[in-house]
């Protein structure tokens, strides 16, 4: 009976381990493109590394695949304009030297539709 329980526990742990979504890394030129995933398999985050530091555009998504953040890194430091989406709000955050320099918020109703 002990052997059956041990085998069942081992089998279950193997099944759960196999279902874990592992990050994907791909060498592109002198950078490494990284893609991270939510438990449901949807892309969570994607961007590049250069010399082990975050570099260039990074995009984050929620579990449903909707974009929730986009911004730029330079040598591991947040730079320029970053955009963060929540339910009804778009936040624009300006970074200078990895520090927040300015924040602007727009509600869904304030955005112009064409």
What are these regions (language model features)?
Residues 1-4, 19:
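Positively charged n-region of N-terminal signal peptides that target proteins for export
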Residues 4-13:
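Sec-dependent N-terminal signal peptides
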Residues 14-114:
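Glycine/tyrosine- and acidic-biased, solvent-exposed loop/turn segments at the edges of beta-strands
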